[in-house]
Amino acid sequence: MPPVLLTKRIEFAAAHRYGRPEWGDAKNRAVFGRCYNPPAHGHNYLLELTVSGDIDPTTGMVVNLFDLKRVLLDVIEEFDHKNLNLDMPYFKDRIPTSENFAHVLWTKLAAQRDIGALHTLRLC
């Protein structure tokens, strides 16, 4: 039997602002548009994590979805209702774009145990 994919979704909120400190206001506005507006702007994010694996013949599961949800909640708790620029050390030296944020989340989730093999992370 081929591996099975399971996806869990979770919602959370966070704020951020794009900008490069070495650029002036004009260049930041030209490159980042409204995402440069001070002090920040917020998003209601939807994180979808897809894991893959073989079905365990004893449990009938690839992963216990309660465990997967708990891990997602634990990881997201650090970011929920935070200003990514000001509150998160991950973005001290990089812009908190959706791409960079997804990379940080992937790295944190990849370090978790017992949630199957990470397949896809989607940040909406």
Go through each PLM region and give its residues.
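Charge-rich, low-complexity N-terminal segments
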Residues: 1-124
